[in-house]
Structures are given as structure tokens and as C-alpha cells.
Amino acid sequence: MTARTLYDKLWELHEVTRRDDGSSLIYIDRHILHEVTSPQAFEGLRLAGRKPWRIDANIATPDHNVPTTRAERQGGLESISDEVSRLQVQTLDENCDDFGILEFKMNDARQGIVHVVGPEQGATLPGMTVVCGDSHTSTHGAFGALAHGIGTSEVEHVLATQCLIAKKMKNMQVRVEGTLPFGVTAKDIVLAVIGKIGTAGGNGHALEFAGSAIRTLSMEGRMTICNMAIEAGARVGMVAVDEKTIAYVRGRPFAPKGAHWDAAVALWSTLVSDPDAHFDTVVELRAEDIKPQVSWGTSPEMVLAIDQHVPDPAIEQDPTKRDSIERALKYMGLKANQPITAIRLDRVFIGSCTNSRIEDLRAAAAVAKGRKVASTIKQALVVPGSGLVKAQAEAEGLDKVFLDAGFEWREPGCSMCLAMNPDKLGSGEHCASTSNRNFEGRQGAGGRTHLVSPAMAAAAAVSGHFVDVRELQGIESRE
């Protein structure tokens, strides 16, 4: 038998039929819905007189538009001040009620960001195809699943047929070998990858992360890396199944039980790339070479190590790249050759589908403990990715650590990752953010976003500017 990649295996498991034009009909195991991309899809079902093909394959939760202050959440739907946002959340509630779809509503203890809720509920399982009307659905690939975002029209197709038409992509492997240095995280790995291959590097590919450094990551770390595969240009990101994958899934609400569990584990254990499998593109990094990363510009590929300087367009030979650097410098209000550590900040955001899980909050709290948010920081937000993450953090006392340090402790939601709810940047404000995109206006009109890990964000909050978190944590923490 021909050696196959993980992507090849997942594709073959779900290919219903192959069409003459080279596309295939692919079966979808899990569909996750939120309030922004689903209203028109549900309306399409109504107009056509259809019902969802498999109601139990769908779960939903509002996340993009929900407010994150306790007072606003306690006020229910009427507390959502923006009319469009309120209507979208209300419409999701009504649609899920009408069609019988399980929804974790805004004040349900299980509510949260779709890409946090799916895995923690066990609704994301190894070997599945998972789709959602959100580009960061690649997150779920951390479980050895074939997961990607879809548009609103495709949301309707999945609801109606449980299938999608797709063309198979090329295979790409990113190998990270070696031991991660002290203070370097999954977020730093994926930012370094994007810095190396660019935001178009993975175009047309399904990207598998592999290597000894990837295998040592927790499931939370693997989700962070797969989450940002889309920023590397790849629609799909994935990590092969191993004992960590299976241990994470075991006992979760949607996970199989009894004999079904044993059968599932037997299948899941085969979801690895064969040793001689062919990859169209292979990218290699040494873990020892990666340092804490900070994005400086208006694209995730504009990223540098903490000890570097903002680039100088005058020495860039490529005119297109030179223009891009000049525009980014102007928008970000930075100067050529400025040290990354000299970038002063206005706000700090710890959250998003990239970095809002319990491991992320523990890492940030370890830095914040016993320190205070710098007086120059206008606001430092910590937004858990779900109600269950929030409850776990509070059980561990992390909320008290953050509050004592001067951070705000919020309710779950997408929050400041994107300007679709009250948590926004003002024009010209610099933010150290654990989110995934730093485009112009992403966090608010004129806002300036710098992508970092949770530990780096916490270090920036207590310093007022970017610092190497390893210096704050001290050499003794290495032991």
C-alpha cells in the first residue's frame, strides 16, 4: 500500500464520491455554529422547507458579539448595546430552538469561544471532519482531525446535507525538532513559522506540524499552533494523534464510552503519517533557535524575536517589500531600527481562540503574580475562552492573581480579538495581544496590534513595554 500522510488518511475516510472535475463530496462529522455566519444559512433552510440532515452533528454557542463584563452578561440579551450584535445573538438562540440544535447560550456555564468549547466538550474528536463558519476552525486539527472554516453558503449546505464539495489540497509538513528553550511557547513557535514562510507560504496546502518539539506540546499548545495555520496561508493545520490526544478526549461529554471508546481508540491510533509518506513541501525549524516573538507590523509575518529591532525599509532591496514595511511603520507609529523592547503599550489583551485556555491563563498568572500592571497601561484584560475555563481558573485562584495585579477579569467571549463587541482599541493605541491577527483596524479603527504569547503579554502589562519574559521569570525558573 502507498504510504499516506495524515491528511491523505482523513480525506479518504470522508470522501463520499469523486467528481469528474477533480473535486470530491466530503462527509462532515461535526458542525459548530456561532451567531455571525449562521443567520442567513438558517433562513435558507426555512425558505427551502428543509431541516438539518443530522441535528446531533451540530452544536452552537454565541461568542463574537457577546459582552464580557459581568454586569452586561447578567443583564441578558437586552444588555448588548449594539443593535446588530444583539440581533445576531438573539437570532442564534431562536434558530437553535426552532431546529432543535444544542446551543450553549450566552449565560450557560458551558458557553465560550467556539474553538475552545468544541474540544473541551469532546465534540471535536480524532479522525473527524470539523467545520465552522470561522477561519480559525483549523484549531481543531490539533486532535488529528480535518478541520477548516467555511462560508455562510457552505454553512447552509452542511446543515442541509452534512456534506461539502471540496478539492484535495497538497501536503505540507512543518517539522520543529529539538528542545524548546526556557520561556518559549507554542505561540512563539507558530509566529516563528509564519515569519519564516510568510502568510502565503501554506497556500493550497494542508499543513501538518510534526517533530519532537511539537510532540512535547500539550493539547492546548497544539491548538494554539493549529489555530494560526490560517495565518500561514493554510486552510488546514493538524497534529498526529498520540497518547496526549487520547488522554485529553477521555471522559469528555461527547466522547465515546465503553466498547465504543475502545474501538475509537483503535482507529485513532492509526491517524499518523506513514514514515515514507510524501509531502509536497517540507519546512524545518530548530526549536533551540526560537526566541519569544513579537509582531511589529500589520501582518502576522511581520514578526521578530524580542531582542531584535524594527526593520529599516531603506536597506530592503525588494520594492514591494520596502513599500509594505514603510506602510506598516506609518500605521503602527514606529521608527526604523527601533528596538522591540522600546515599543510602549497602551493596552494588553489575554484571550481569544488562540490563547484563552487554562494553560494560557496559568502562564500569564505566573508572570503577573506579585507584580502590578504598569501605571502607563490603560487597560489589561484577561478573558477566559469558556465558562468552564473561567471556573477552573477561579478554582485555582488565578482570578485573584490577576485582580491583585490590576488586570480585569472578564466573562468568556471573543472580546478584543476583533472589533465586534464593546472591547476595542482606540485609534493609535498599541496593544500586546494573545490573539491571531494584527491587520489594520482588527481590534478597533486605528488600533495597533502586537501578537505575543500569554506570558509575554503579562510581562508587557507589568512593564509598560515589551520585555523578554525570561528576564522577569529569572534564571532560577529554568531549573
UniProtKB/Swiss-Prot annotation:
**What biological processes does GO assign it?**
L-leucine biosynthetic process
Signal sequence, renumbered to the chain: none
Pfam families xrefs: Aconitase
Entry's EC annotation: 4.2.1.33
- Which SUPFAM superfamilies does the record cross-reference, listed alphabetically? Aconitase iron-sulfur domain
> From which residue to which does any coiled coil extend?
none
Query: Which molecular-function annotation in GO is an example for this chain?
Result: metal ion binding
**Which sites bind [4Fe-4S] cluster?**
C353, C414, C417
Q: Which CDD domains match?
A: IPMI
User: What cofactors are annotated for this protein?
Assistant: [4Fe-4S] cluster
Q: Which reaction does it catalyse?
A: (2R,3S)-3-isopropylmalate = (2S)-2-isopropylmalate
EC primary class:
lyase
Q: In which pathway does it act?
A: Amino-acid biosynthesis; L-leucine biosynthesis; L-leucine from 3-methyl-2-oxobutanoate: step 2/4
As to how many cofactors bind and how, the note says: Binds 1 [4Fe-4S] cluster per subunit.
* Keywords from the named record: 4Fe-4S, Amino-acid biosynthesis, Branched-chain amino acid biosynthesis, Iron, Iron-sulfur, Leucine biosynthesis, Lyase, Metal-binding
Quaternary structure and partners: Heterodimer of LeuC and LeuD.
Q: What does the sequence similarity comment in the record state about its family?
A: Belongs to the aconitase/IPM isomerase family. LeuC type 1 subfamily.
Sum up the protein's function in the record's words: Catalyzes the isomerization between 2-isopropylmalate and 3-isopropylmalate, via the formation of 2-isopropylmaleate.
Which protein is depicted? 3-isopropylmalate dehydratase large subunit
